[in-house]
């Protein structure tokens, strides 16, 4: 808890809260404790545009605050999901902001320099995640879904190269993949360079298979077809093909991409 309070952005926001509000980080022990406190609580999480590199120690660009849950909770307990159940008013500047985001290749992590992908053949992208990540547990996923995702990508795209984008934590923090060694070494599969940015991945892959990774939302912003296998904030609004095993959390309406960007990147972050 002390480490959370030392976070400069948390510290600034916490000073504005009632002293009776309990707070914690996402669904880590501090956040779960705050949520179970029986009173008002605030949960902090990484935003859609976080930092240069993943992990701890680097400068962080922003933070999200949620009075109900986290945006990757399949139960739908989140201020973001609650807002998306209603109308989203798109501000006049938002289309230009989204276009600028796309043109600059901005992502959650921004450590990669632009790369020349002309030597790659256009193909299909599978997005890996870090084994044990909270969005897997709370996003209605288990590891059998990564097997389904992998098998579907190969079966549905028999003539296309299959690329896998591993999570940056695999390079920076030695986190394990959600795919087996056999899958990663499959003859039709190529592991993309760790320092290839999401924006460059989307230049060579216009179809993307994803669990709950935020790269799925980034793929939508870059105009890709997105197939999901878990329930994150961008699934279920009519923009994605959804194959999650768990029942879809209630979605009261559909949204355009610009409405989703307004809600997730402007209002919530």
Give the label of every model feature segment.
Residues 1-269:
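Catalytic-core helical/loop segments in enzymes performing group transfer/polymerization on anionic/lipid-linked
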């Amino acid at each position: 808890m002390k480490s959370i309070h030392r976070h400069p952005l948390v510290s600034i926001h916490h000073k504005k809260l009632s002293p009776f509000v309990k707070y914690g980080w996402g669904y880590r022990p501090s956040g779960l404790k705050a949520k179970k406190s029986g009173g008002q609580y605030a949960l902090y999480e990484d935003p859609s545009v976080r930092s240069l590199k993943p992990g701890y120690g680097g400068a962080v660009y922003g933070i999200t605050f949620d009075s109900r849950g986290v945006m990757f909770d399949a139960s739908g307990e989140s201020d973001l999901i609650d807002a998306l159940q209603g109308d989203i008013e798109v501000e006049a500047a938002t289309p230009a902001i989204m276009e600028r985001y796309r043109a600059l290749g901005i992502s959650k992590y921004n450590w990669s320099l632009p790369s020349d992908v002309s030597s790659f053949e256009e193909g299909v992208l599978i997005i890996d995640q870090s084994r044990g990540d909270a969005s897997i547990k709370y996003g209605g996923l288990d590891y059998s879904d990564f097997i389904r995702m992998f098998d579907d990508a190969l079966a549905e795209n028999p003539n296309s190269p299959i690329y896998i984008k591993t999570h940056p934590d695999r390079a920076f923090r030695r986190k394990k993949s959600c795919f087996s060694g056999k899958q990663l070494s499959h003859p039709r599969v190529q592991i993309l360079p760790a320092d290839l940015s999401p924006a460059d991945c989307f230049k060579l892959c216009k179809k993307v298979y994803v669990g709950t990774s935020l790269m799925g939302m980034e793929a939508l912003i870059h105009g890709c077809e997105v197939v999901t296998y878990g329930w994150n904030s961008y699934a279920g609004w009519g923009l994605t093909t959804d194959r999650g095993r768990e029942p879809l959390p209630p979605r009261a309406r559909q949204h355009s991409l610009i409405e989703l960007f307004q809600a997730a990147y402007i209002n919530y972050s």
